[in-house]
Amino acid sequence: MSRNRKLVHTVVVPIRWGDMDAMGHVNNTVYFRYMEQARVDWTHAFARRLGRVAYAGDGPLIVNASCTFFAPLTYPGKAEVRMFLGVPGRTSVESYYEIWMDGKKYADGAAKLVWIDMKTTRPVPLPEPLRALLDIAETAPSPTPADAKPS
């Protein structure tokens, strides 16, 4: 997961009995729904801050999504989904997600968001208020242990 990212939204999602599968844990497809809930909530909150209606005129479209599972979530419980955004490109930004419950991380996720004109479905530049929100330094990430130089 990128080190150049900013926490933009957190949502608590109740785990429903119907989220479970025959294996007795939350089905892997539901993790994507939890991330979707965080993303949609954030999109609406961001639009409200701008005095706009979400998805009216322009907004994010997912072009890919992934999830890495660390442990199975089970009912009952409440999953905390943390949404982060990375360094913006011209028309896109990477979103990252962490799914937690009771102080333990259960999954990491990611989705590339391309900002589009809703009528034409063509990419458009990211809104300036989104760029200002992110304002993440576009510097090289800190060295990883493999990159670190001996002292």
Q: How would you describe each model-predicted region?
A:
Residues 1-80, 86-151:
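Terminal targeting signals and extreme-terminal segments of soluble enzymes
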